């Protein structure tokens, strides 16, 4: 086993990486509220795992979506648990994200030289909210249908471009199969990919600049 480790150590310098991670200085003023970003990340990872598991059973069509969710909850092995964890962690992720943004703002973590960290964080917050909107529509139940109809209808009040924006969001003039397909694609592919990209920008900047000091 040691020979295998030595082989990787010689090429990747694993010990140096481990030492850098474990020896990072943590300011004395840091408390549990500075863990909110990490908790949000943990919730996101839970979302990815449970969401991936549900894609094996979920069918993104207006005629089968609701029935497939019922199947997950009543027939699939541990499906009820996986979907419940997905819902609970989704709510927790939104809550932790909001608290994290407030903590950073109230402690001045957005100030120089951390402006870019703040910008990427705000983008991640918007992406988190987008997860909620797109995911809410996927069960194709009454609550999800009317929520999507209202949310996608908001831009209609904008002069000139309002109606085209609504059609762009829905895929048609009304909420239907095109809307479900778009929201499913956004929820399972586009948003996770964008979130991963901005996380890969966000965390190295935190690592490089360190945690902001007390006010």
UniProtKB/Swiss-Prot annotation:
Cofactor note: Binds 2 heme b groups non-covalently with two histidine residues as axial ligands.
Residues given in the record as heme c binding sites: 35
UniProt keyword list: Chloroplast, Electron transport, Heme, Iron, Membrane, Metal-binding, Photosynthesis, Plastid, Thylakoid, Transmembrane, Transmembrane helix, Transport
Membrane topology listed for this record: Multi-pass membrane protein
Domain of life: Eukaryota
TM region positions: 32-52, 90-110, 116-136, 186-206
Gene Ontology CC, one term: chloroplast thylakoid membrane
Cofactor: heme b; heme c
InterPro entries in UniProt: Cyt_b/b6_N (IPR005797), Cyt_B6_PetB (IPR023530), Cytb/b6-like_sf (IPR027387), Cytochrome_b_N_euk/bac (IPR048259), Di-haem_cyt_TM (IPR016174)
Residues annotated for heme b 2 binding in this entry: 86, 187
Molecular functions (GO terms): electron transporter, transferring electrons within cytochrome b6/f complex of photosystem II activity; metal ion binding; oxidoreductase activity
GO biological process terms held by the UniProt record: photosynthesis; respiratory electron transport chain
UniProt subcellular location: Plastid, Chloroplast thylakoid membrane
Residues that bind heme b 1: 100, 202
Role description: Component of the cytochrome b6-f complex, which mediates electron transfer between photosystem II (PSII) and photosystem I (PSI), cyclic electron flow around PSI, and state transitions.
Further details from the record: Heme 1 (or BH or b566) is high-potential and absorbs at about 566 nm, and heme 2 (or BL or b562) is low-potential and absorbs at about 562 nm.
Family the UniProt entry places it in: Belongs to the cytochrome b family. PetB subfamily.
Assembly notes: The 4 large subunits of the cytochrome b6-f complex are cytochrome b6, subunit IV (17 kDa polypeptide, PetD), cytochrome f and the Rieske protein, while the 4 small subunits are PetG, PetL, PetM and PetN. The complex functions as a dimer.
Protein name: Cytochrome b6
């Amino acid at each position: 086993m040691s020979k295998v480790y030595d082989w990787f150590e010689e090429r990747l310098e694993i010990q140096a990486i481990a030492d850098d991670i474990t020896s990072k200085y943590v300011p004395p003023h840091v408390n549990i509220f500075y863990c909110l970003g990490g908790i949000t990340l943990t919730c996101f990872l839970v979302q990815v795992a449970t969401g991936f598991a549900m894609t094996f059973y979920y069918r993104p069509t207006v005629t089968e979506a609701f029935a497939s969710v019922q199947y997950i909850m009543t027939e699939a092995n541990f499906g009820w648990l996986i979907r419940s964890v997905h819902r609970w962690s989704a709510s927790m992720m939104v809550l932790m994200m909001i608290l994290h943004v407030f903590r950073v703002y109230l402690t001045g973590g957005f100030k120089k030289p951390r402006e870019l960290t703040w910008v990427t964080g705000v983008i991640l917050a918007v992406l988190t909210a987008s997860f909620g909107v797109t995911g809410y529509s996927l069960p194709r139940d009454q609550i999800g249908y009317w929520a999507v109809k209202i949310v996608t209808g908001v831009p209609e009040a904008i002069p000139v471009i309002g109606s085209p924006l609504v059609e762009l969001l829905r895929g048609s003039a009304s909420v239907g199969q095109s809307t479900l397909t778009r929201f499913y694609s956004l929820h399972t592919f586009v948003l996770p990919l964008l979130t991963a990209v901005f996380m890969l920008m966000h965390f190295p900047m935190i690592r490089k600049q360190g945690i902001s000091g007390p006010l």
